[in-house]
């Protein structure tokens, strides 16, 4: 999984091509940390079709706000730099994340 920061987000996500899934988390988010190993496994399953990345919002609050990240965990799917879908908070289960990815890449 690609680790993003406020300096690499624009290049990797907003100027990227294809699908990029961004896992927004923070240091104090227990549900985020619980979900991360499963998301890392998903990244292996979709390798070559979807770029999986994560961004620690603790050091990038303005960036998170600019992307309308209002709660954690949030996983946003971007296509060619545009956010096309996301799951957040209680809906951020590994099943919902995989369903979101499948729905978009199968189009």
UniProtKB/Swiss-Prot annotation:
Instruction: Name the UniProt key words of this record, in alphabetical order.
Output: Disulfide bond, Electron transport, Redox-active center, Transport
Domain Thioredoxin, by residue range, is 2-106
Q: Got any disulfides in this one, which pairs?
A: 29-32
What's the superkingdom here?
Bacteria
Which Pfam family, any one of them, does this sequence belong to?
A: Thioredoxin
Q: Which GO terms describe its cellular component?
A: cytoplasm
A single GO molecular-function term is: protein-disulfide reductase activity
As for family, the record states:
Belongs to the thioredoxin family.
**Protein name, entry field:** Thioredoxin
Q: Which organism is it from?
A: Peptoclostridium litorale
């Amino acid at each position: 999984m690609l680790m993003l920061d406020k300096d690499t987000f624009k290049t990797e996500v907003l100027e990227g091509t294809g699908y990029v899934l961004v896992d927004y988390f923070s240091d104090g988010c227990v549900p985020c940390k619980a979900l991360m190993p499963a998301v890392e496994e998903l990244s292996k399953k979709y390798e070559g079709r979807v770029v999986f990345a994560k961004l620690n919002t603790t050091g990038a609050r303005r960036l998170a706000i600019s992307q309308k990240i209002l709660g954690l965990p949030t996983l946003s799917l971007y296509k060619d730099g545009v956010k096309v879908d996301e799951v957040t908070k209680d809906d951020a289960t590994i099943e919902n994340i995989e369903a979101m990815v499948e729905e978009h890449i199968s189009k």
